[in-house]
Amino acid sequence: MVKIYPQVLSIAGSDSGGGSGIQADLKAFQTLGVFGTSVITCITAQNTQGVHGVYPLSVESVKAQILAIRDDFSIKAFKMGALCNAQIIECVADTLETCDFGLCVLDPVMVAKNGALLLEEEAILSLKKRLLPTTHLLTPNLPEVYALTGVQVRDDKSASKAMGVLRDLGVKNAVIKGGHTEHFQGEYSNDWVFLEDAEFILNAKRFNTKNTHGTGCTLSSLIVGLLAQGLDLKNAISKAKELLTIIIQNPLNIGHGHGPLNLWSIKELV
């Protein structure tokens, strides 16, 4: 009997170092046992020490990739990551209107590790107008929350305030990730989960490692894979966070900078 694997999609950038973007997404999909497809929005020259170049693809090539997936695959859920510029965002939004790819998880890659904005203002406006209202789940980190809402999240109250602004922008559900910030250096880090029918906090003990490149990409990809396998949103988020915590606690020693994640560490658990 031929086993049927759920089919999923990532629309994101390519990371030559293999730690984030499309490469991280496909590794997460494979680990979960779902079949991953991809639409590449940009090529990046990067490694564990940094990003050395970003080269957006043409809107024609992005559209062609989406249509190729639409015409041949039964996508159960999909994610979007780095979308580079307003032209690509508009292209993706327009083309997705002709597709039925299931639930969408948007990981809004907007801010570099050094705090620099990766999207220009025009692109941020397009993201807010065209993609936020149609996204099933948004997974921003704190700098991305600030870029979208103007709210500095430091505690439960400010997280709720930020979610209020996101809801005004059309966001239905969000995971506000609290791990990547100087404001939270305690024993635990919080992720604030705001769903249409529930609100809760996921906390995990901090693990002292620099090898966390691609955590945001991997979390959103794990959620997509688990949704495609039939989990509801609440359980998919909780399970993905649990798996990501195990991954971070079992780091790889690859490269000379911020190394990639160890997806092998959860192979026996999924």
From Swiss-Prot:
Keywords: ATP-binding, Kinase, Nucleotide-binding, Thiamine biosynthesis, Transferase
ATP-binding recorded as keyword: yes
Source organism per UniProt: Helicobacter pylori (strain ATCC 700392 / 26695)
Signal peptide start-end: none
E.C. numbers: 2.7.1.49, 2.7.4.7
Native organism taxonomy: Bacteria, Pseudomonadati, Campylobacterota, Epsilonproteobacteria, Campylobacterales
Pathway(s) served: Cofactor biosynthesis; thiamine diphosphate biosynthesis; 4-amino-2-methyl-5-diphosphomethylpyrimidine from 5-amino-1-(5-phospho-D-ribosyl)imidazole: step 2/3; Cofactor biosynthesis; thiamine diphosphate biosynthesis; 4-amino-2-methyl-5-diphosphomethylpyrimidine from 5-amino-1-(5-phospho-D-ribosyl)imidazole: step 3/3
Name of the molecule in the record: Hydroxymethylpyrimidine/phosphomethylpyrimidine kinase
One Gene Ontology MF term: ATP binding
Catalytic reaction equation(s): 4-amino-5-hydroxymethyl-2-methylpyrimidine + ATP = 4-amino-2-methyl-5-(phosphooxymethyl)pyrimidine + ADP + H(+); 4-amino-2-methyl-5-(phosphooxymethyl)pyrimidine + ATP = 4-amino-2-methyl-5-(diphosphooxymethyl)pyrimidine + ADP
Residues bound to 4-amino-5-hydroxymethyl-2-methylpyrimidine: Q46
Purpose: Catalyzes the phosphorylation of hydroxymethylpyrimidine phosphate (HMP-P) to HMP-PP, and of HMP to HMP-P.
GO biological process, one term: thiamine biosynthetic process
Family: Belongs to the ThiD family.
Gene3D superfamilies from the UniProt entry: 3.40.1190.20
CDD domains to which the protein is assigned, alphabetical: HMPP_kinase
One GO term describing the cellular component: cytosol
Keyword Nucleotide-binding: yes
